[in-house]
């Protein structure tokens, strides 16, 4: 019986990881509207509120989904996430994570600690 439980647990972990892992190349295409505020590999953003480059994709997914479900509200973000699927969010989060460091380090720009704090709410 314990073997069956161990196999079931391993299968659940593997399937969850496969679903949660996004594709950065697809995320780059789907997240083009995110670049104006959050930047990209070669662009810091017009008014970079939160630079997402190199951020933990799980934290980004959690926070983005809170905007999608209405648990968090922002005039810009709440509109930006309309129509995104779970897969879209995973892909966009993977894209920003794959960038590494932000194009332009800006003092005072919020980062992972803000994302983690808001995601925990």
What spans do the regions from the language model cover?
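Flexible coil segments in periplasmic/lumen-exposed cytochrome c-class electron-transfer proteins
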Residues: 21-31, 40, 72-75, 79-121
